[in-house]
Amino acid sequence: GGKSFVDSLDPDGVDVLVLAGDIGVVKGGSLHRGFDLLATKYRGIPIIFLMGNHELYGSSPDWAEEQVDALTKDHPNLHWLENNTVEIGGQRFVGSTLWFPNLPDGQNTRFSRGLNDFHLIYDFQQWVYDHNAASVEFLTREVQPGDVVVTHHIPTVQGVHPRWLHDVQGFGRFFLSQMPDDVLQRPKLWFYGHTHDSMDFEIGGCRFLCNPFGYVRREENPRFNPKLLMGV
């Protein structure tokens, strides 16, 4: 289970641990158990965390957010980012789950029938589009040169692995939210998750990194680097 993910990590030389979501499910306690393990392994080290879509499975967004807010009070080194900014050691971290928009082609409803998010998260459909719009507005306003940005969903089509590019107008529309070019080029580093393929590329002066473990029982990403360290 998730213990294999935690066991794979090496805290040596780490000043800040960044987790871009899908760490566990709030309902049922797997997220809480994961952070009990992480808080022990990274004792005294700040942990930047944001929720992915899996954290919300089996619950409503409002209820899950209340539980995560309480979780941060149990672990003082845990910093939950959701349309907010935290500064650690003089470095700004700006974060948002981000989600995905209701595309103007009117096809979201048709494709949504195949996405677990719409079936396993309560009170989701209108919430997700409103939340995405608020997140895009927040990041557009908040991100400054030199920032480190963390999102769960992919912020640009360039961050989609080539094997999924054929589907970005289909089911893949729920993987990303295309941010404006000027926002993408503003920070120096942008971490994201959601996809289970490692990615590393640049847009303007910003480096984009995705380093996912993937589903723990499938060992599906052989390129996952448990010792990935980025200097900022």
Residue ranges with predicted function:
Residues 46-119:
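A basic- and aromatic-enriched beta-loop-alpha substructure that forms the phosphate/nucleotide-
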Residues 1, 90-99, 148-152, 207-213:
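Active-site-proximal beta-strand elements of phosphoester/diester hydrolases
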Residues 76, 86-87, 161, 170-189, ...:
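Binuclear metal-dependent phosphoesterase catalytic core
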Residues 27-30, 63-67, 127-138, 171-178:
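Soluble or luminal CAZymes and related metallo-dependent hydrolases
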Residues 1-5, 25-29, 54-64, 85-87, ...:
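Active-site environment of divalent metal-dependent phosphoester hydrolases
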Residues 17-22, 48-53, 79-83, 148-151, ...:
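Active-site neighborhood of phospho(di)ester-bond hydrolases with catalytic His/Asp-centered motifs
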Residues 1-50, 55-63:
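N-terminal active-site segment of His-dependent metallophosphoesterases
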Residues 94-170:
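Active-site-proximal loop/helix segment associated with metal-binding centers of metalloenzymes
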